[in-house]
């Protein structure tokens, strides 16, 4: 493969649509290969903006505004890194010959829970929990009654756990309805899911380069309010369950097609595997790979996009812990205890320009046996504060 220098007439360009902490790591990997990076987001000084050659601030759901930037920059690869973007812009760009990663249809399916659930369950016939779609509170009450309690209620379009809740009884329905309606994204339709009585859930990072598919070791994770707070790798599971998880991950990613890394979320009950969701981009729980693998999920994503070999070394077990802001501040300062910087631990600061309560600002990473690493990560993250 031929490489060139950035900011030249023959440079190879990638455009990140979404410039958060995950996009920032992808941008850094692209810089290491001499690619020219254009980072786009809805707000100024997003994390990837500081490591890109050029950046833009735009309404990410404005089709014409996005297309104007794409046509101006003429990127070789367009990498959607968030869900709240204009899918019409991606389809039009793809029709014009631009390379959308993994492809516009895959992005369209995965950004909408109705599309991906019906595709997975009814087209690919993957095992899932029971579900219904509703558009009114009355329909929600009826669906919850049929599916039983507890049940999980989510907008068909939202990101990072926004708008999700668990209704444990009929008395929770009103609150769940309001939570869903306040979510960023499209809350005009909700998915109601029967609660899967799973033992644990995993992320199966799956990379495709057009010639091969590779899997990272399964990642266990802990969520609060639908958002990741801790992850560890590998998740201990039976060989049968692991093989079934890889088979399911391959089936869904083959069905979506294209190149890149996918975060496939699965529920595990004994040796049984249930499909939950899939993201066609690096996954927040996969930040643990920054310390466990020779090629992180971000490096693998870029390699897959470029069609490069996907071999990597799993260095060993580890864990990650997300730090979420405890205050609101327009110029946040993060206080990190020196104990986080050891021979087997470190911290990554995302450089977000503004903090608000619950916003993810940093991640602590620990290299050790998974159980000990997770315990240490829990301890270390308490030594990070913001003001």
UniProtKB/Swiss-Prot annotation:
Pfam families xrefs: ATP-grasp, PurT_C, RS_preATP-grasp-like
Keyword Metal-binding appears in the UniProt entry: yes
Keywords in alphabetical order: ATP-binding, Ligase, Magnesium, Metal-binding, Nucleotide-binding, Purine biosynthesis
UniProt superkingdom: Bacteria
Alphabetized HAMAP family for the sequence: PurT
UniProt record similarity statement: Belongs to the PurK/PurT family.
Protein name (database record): Formate-dependent phosphoribosylglycinamide formyltransferase
